[in-house]
Amino acid sequence: MPANDPQKPHTPMMQQYLRIKAEYPNTLLLYRMGDFYELFYDDAQRASELLDIALTSRGRSAGEPIPMAGIPYHALDSYLARLVRQGESVAICEQIGNPAASKGPVERQVVRIITPGTVTEEALLEARRDNLLAALQKEGDVFGFAVLDLCSGRFNILEVASESAATSELARIRPAELLVSEDLALILVDSKTEAVVRPLPPWYFDRESAQRQLCRQFGTQDLAGFGCEEMKTAIAAAGCLLHYVQDTQRTQFPHIHALQVERQETSIILDPSTRRNLELEESLSGDSGRNTLIAVLDHTATAMGSRLLRRYLHRPLRDQTLLKQRQQALATLLEGGLSDVLQTLLRGIGDIERILSRVALRSARPRDLVQFRQALGLLPKIQESLLQLNRDSLLLQSLQEDLGPFPNLHELLQRAICENPPVLIRDGGVIALGFDSELDELRHLSGNAGQFLVKLEQRERERTKIPTLKVGYNKVHGYYLEITRAQAHQAPPDYIRRQTLKGAERYITPELKGFEDQVLSARERALAREKALYEELLEQFMEPLPALRACANALAELDVLHNLAERAKTLEYVAPLLSDQPGIFIERGRHPVVEQTLEDPFVPNDLTLHEARRMLIITGPNMGGKSTYMRQTALIVLLAHIGSFVPARRAVIGPIDRIFTRIGAADDLAGGRSTFMVEMTETANILHNATEHSLVLLDEVGRGTSTFDGLSLAWAVVSHLANKVRSLTLFATHYFELTTLPECLPGVVNLHLTATEHKEHIVFLHAVKEGPASQSYGLQVAALAGVPQEIIAQARQQLMELENNTWQKSINGGGPQLDLLAPPADHPAVQILQDLDPDELTPRQALEKLYELKQLLDLAVTH
């Protein structure tokens, strides 16, 4: 920004710009000037880099050149989308004064601030992902979350009691923008959140102010009706969030009318590592489009259904009553034959959830209302389709009741909006002919201008005897009568010269001037009238807005249920039995994603876990299918807890509170953590937080360090989980020493993935069998990976020597392989003490034994 030089003052326009910019120092200020939004100084330089637009200059002000960049006003949305995707906040500064009446710069003011978490425009949003604004506050050990989807009006709060739980919630919510107090922002520096973190002064999180602000928004005396009176930390976060959106959006929010309380104990907790390893929305290779669970499951007909399905996946429920209602709904839809009619009807609904939010914010465009009109017209047909199903599903009945219809609003939109309106209301031609008599009259006046001008031209030609006379119009001079310079002497006395050209003269007459004033006034008045009618039309949505939102929610849920039913039929999924007894039983289970990517048939496998069989030690070759088997178990459990059918012949799923996975690892270079450090951090999280109701998947624990260290750690982790935590655990390993654990640890069982060797080539059978694997097939897998044959031959020779040497040392007493399960050898002093009978020793004998023990201790120290 320029320094103010009192000797060289800024121009009035730049003074206005700098005054407004000073109020928004951390945003890009788009300053409206005619048909462009201009950026100056540092903003111009940054916008030029981010948008790849030309950086120019606009003269000088206060003696300094003014860097400038600009974007056309009609292309604003496309540029905003690029800026928001890069995490920028943008202040839109519009001309609100009348240029004709302004002596100095036209009056301007910021009408809205667009931030990553407050976007509502369709062009700026990903259709199938929620765009969330979150606020996080910490008081003592309690973390309070508030989460707002401004595009739908959903406003949720949640409290958790640990940093690990807060991290898990942050991974689930995945906000586009996160508001935190300035002191808490320091804690989040090392977090892996992709959100734009917005540090705010502590007073934004003042509890009393938050309480007042929330009650004012909801029109209530207190917050008791929302069940959150005691959630002080979350309320502080919610107040901050509401203050922020009011400050940036500068409008009312009638679609935000309630707080919904979420409780972590009602859902299965998935930590960030688990969400990543299960590849719910993004594969481990970073591809978000393919080879993910959502890619297999999401065949929804609407964008709002797709967003709801993602919320299901990221927050699997523990409430068996609700899950069984969803299962019953799927069964009812399947029994009804899954007609394509319902799918087609849903596809015609569009994204009315987000359209309603734009209506509430008064930013809905004409084509939004056309789409909403179409959706309202389809509601009776959707209801009819549901009525044809049997009445066993209470959930489908409830959804059907929420679908309206809304005949009065539908009829109003049919009368009010033309068939194919322009994009913007300011372009005119949105309100249908016949809806408003005053508008029709103004349109008639301006619309018949052509006929009047044709008649005027013909009449003036006859009057002046000038056959080449013509009537024209331009934006600068308005309407005119034009004759050639050679015929100018024939112009009647009432012709008033308006413009002189090289070969022609242009004139105005009192009659033409009167017509011009009337027509231009009619056009302006018609646009103003149309805008007023449009605002009145949006107002008609306000009273039924809660019911319309319930309708949109019901359509989204119906879309998800219909989609899951179709997936179950197409992919041959079955309804899992949800049990109150701990354990998991899966017959012929399949990995939902892997089976869709294979050319060969997927090999299904069984799994049994129960009170007496709580841990499976899984061995077998690399690429044998251990990780697939483990992941498919977790995914089947997760699908069961969103109410979906599952890829298996039969499944019985007991209570689960958390799913943990530690599968694979990579260096965290940015965080300065090695592969082994990442592995141990994830393992520590499991050991601290797993319970007897948790499903734990551990793959190759200890492989990132030396053999003995890794084996020792793996053995200790298995023992702790089996003896202390008693979680349902799948533990894959190449440490064959661990296969002896079932002999001494109750509830631990060996499984292995089968493979066979044919002419020094390995064949993976991918079948799970009881018992430990017989060998690891490491060299065969290396050959399969393309390791040169001479390297494989040398490795095979080295392996034979190592095995022979180990065997020879063992039989010669040269040191057997470390046996972690053998009890530690007793110190000689222990044996002496065990043989003593203190009651039979004389004082002298006792003193001699004491010296003997001291001697043994000294000997041990010197060695």
Curated annotation (Swiss-Prot):
Record GO biological process: mismatch repair
SUPFAM superfamilies (alphabetical): DNA repair protein MutS, domain I (SSF55271), DNA repair protein MutS, domain II (SSF53150), DNA repair protein MutS, domain III (SSF48334), P-loop containing nucleoside triphosphate hydrolases (SSF52540)
InterPro entries xref list: DNA_mismatch_repair_MutS, DNA_mismatch_repair_MutS-lik_N, DNA_mismatch_repair_MutS/MSH, DNA_mismatch_repair_MutS_C, DNA_mismatch_repair_MutS_clamp, DNA_mismatch_repair_MutS_core, DNA_mismatch_repair_MutS_N, DNA_mismatch_repair_MutS_sf
Binding site for ATP: 620-627
GO MF term (any one): damaged DNA binding
Xref: CDD domains: ABC_MutS1 (cd03284)
UniProt keyword terms in alphabetical order: ATP-binding, DNA damage, DNA repair, DNA-binding, Nucleotide-binding
Any single GO CC term annotated in Swiss-Prot or TrEMBL for this entry: cytosol
Keyword check for Cell wall biogenesis/degradation: no
Source organism, top-level taxon: Bacteria
Function: This protein is involved in the repair of mismatches in DNA. It is possible that it carries out the mismatch recognition step. This protein has a weak ATPase activity.
Family named by the database record: Belongs to the DNA mismatch repair MutS family.
UniProt name for this protein: DNA mismatch repair protein MutS
Species in which this protein is naturally found: Nitrosococcus oceani (strain ATCC 19707 / BCRC 17464 / JCM 30415 / NCIMB 11848 / C-107)
